[in-house]
A protein has these predicted regions:
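Short coil/turn segments at beta-strand junctions that form active-site/ligand-binding loops
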Residues: 19, 121-124
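Core RecA-like ATPase module of SF1/SF2 helicases and allied nucleic-acid translocases
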Residues: 64, 123-278, 283-291, 296, ...
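Amphipathic coiled-coil/heptad-repeat helices and related helical stalk/stem segments
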Residues: 5, 38, 106-110, 246, ...
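Conserved active-site motif detector
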Residues: 300-393
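Short, acidic/turn-prone active-site loops that include or flank metal/cofactor-
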Residues: 17, 27, 152-157, 268, ...
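Conserved interdomain hinge at the start of the Helicase C-terminal
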Residues: 102-121
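Conserved RecA-like helicase ATPase core segment
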Residues: 3-94, 98
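Amphipathic alpha-helical segments in well-structured domains
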Residues: 38-42, 275-279, 374
């Protein structure tokens, strides 16, 4: 929690003497210091409010080998609230490999390791430190015919603004006569959505969003539905689809779990607790298999139960393709002002053509410009160009 959140809780406690406060958190996983989050506010409940601390040490997620390594690494964090080691409740020993390289270009090694491992039918994720590393690995996997999904934080993006969701709401509101949405109207709107957006690659995700709300609501209030759309995060609805390889930075993976995790740590810094906590978060995403590819000595002194140490002397080529996702900050929003009719005809999954200024779509009458890049994104593209990358057409 940050300073403002702590001040809010203090104000609530002052005005509600009988209110019980339960603060739950893991300070070893506090990796949002750059947003103002600080474990000192959690500790102050004990020092200033006479709170009692309980340590929840039973881990039902990860196998023994993963927990053993995580415990050993957590001991390198200097400022900690926890004093007891985590106990794995799994009967599975699992698999941990610490693979040290002599080269900076480890992306290909991670991909080769992933593709040669028996991960069939399980959830798989590649974790990196930087967005560019994640983009390169996702790009290579997709180009090689593997289904890869880049996990994005989608900061500032409201599910309510998805075209498919807006269409669903429009159908509901056209026939809604009370604050409560009837099952008949709900199903009619879902059928209309499936018909109108049958060619949209985002339709399965939107149906998952609607199904999630449907299962959680005994009665469907329009106001509750709107709040659900506004308050939910898009990444919360990404399912662990069989055969899909997720690629993410460690920060964006927080709160998620995967059967198999492959970590890429390129000259990973461990010179402060913030950096150590970030690596700890990455380690603890794994349930059964954890392979860490690194090229400095951060794991050399670890002797943990079930971890296999490997030295890879091979040299690997530099990956020559990356996926670059676009957000609101990357496009010139003013360009869309008079493009409503065109936008409503678009469907997720349609092929876009990259130009020096933005993107076009192919129509019966030729190409049509549908977006323009923002100034800051064009500067990013120039940076990629200087590194030898160019937009794929």
């Amino acid at each position: 929690m940050d300073e403002n959140e702590y001040a809010l809780i203090e104000a609530l406690m002052e005005r509600n003497e009988d209110m019980r406060v339960i603060a739950v958190g893991d300070d070893d996983q506090n990796i949002y210091g750059f947003r103002g989050s600080d474990s000192k506010f959690l500790r102050s409940f004990i020092t200033d409010k006479n709170a009692v601390k309980y340590e929840l040490v039973e881990n039902y997620r990860s196998c023994r080998a993963v927990v053993s390594l995580a415990n050993a690494f957590a001991e390198t964090i200097t400022e900690r609230m926890k004093t007891s080691p985590i106990i794995s409740m799994s009967d599975n020993d699992g698999e941990v490999k610490l693979i040290r390289h002599r080269t900076r270009n480890m992306e290909t090694a991670v991909i080769n390791d992933l593709l040669s491992s028996p991960d069939g039918g399980s959830s798989v994720c590649v974790l990196t430190s930087t967005n560019i590393e994640a983009a390169c690995i996702a790009g290579f996997l997709n180009r090689s015919g593997r289904r890869a999904k880049l996990i994005q934080s989608n900061d500032g993006f409201d599910i309510y603004n998805l075209a498919e969701i807006r269409y669903f709401i429009k159908v509901l509101e056209a026939k809604l006569t009370s604050p409560i949405i009837s099952d008949v109207l709900w199903n009619e709107a879902k059928d209309a959505l499936e018909s109108a957006y049958s060619r949209s690659s985002a339709l399965p995700l939107c149906m998952t969003i609607l199904d999630t709300y449907e299962k959680s609501a005994e009665r469907k209030y329009k106001s509750d539905l709107d709040a659900f759309f506004h308050e939910s995060k898009l990444e919360d609805f990404f399912s662990d689809e069989n055969g899909t390889i997720f690629v993410s930075t460690i920060h964006k993976s927080k709160g998620r779990e995967f059967d198999s995790v492959y970590m890429l740590l390129n000259n990973a810094a461990v010179n402060d607790d913030e950096a150590r906590r970030k690596i700890y978060v990455g380690l603890t995403r794994a349930k059964n298999r954890l392979h860490i590819h690194y090229n400095n000595g951060i794991f050399d002194d670890f002797d943990t139960q079930g971890a296999e140490k490997i030295t890879d002397e091979n040299k690997y080529p530099f990956l020559d393709e990356m996926i670059v996702p676009l957000g609101h900050k990357d496009v010139f929003l003013g360009f869309f002002k008079d493009k409503k009719d065109l936008i409503l005809r678009l469907r997720s999954g349609m092929k876009l053509l990259v130009t020096p200024y933005g993107m076009n779509i192919v129509t019966k009458n030729g190409q049509c410009e549908i977006l323009r890049f923002s100034k800051s994104f064009k500067e990013r593209l120039s940076g990629y160009s200087r590194q030898g990358y160019k937009p794929y057409k």
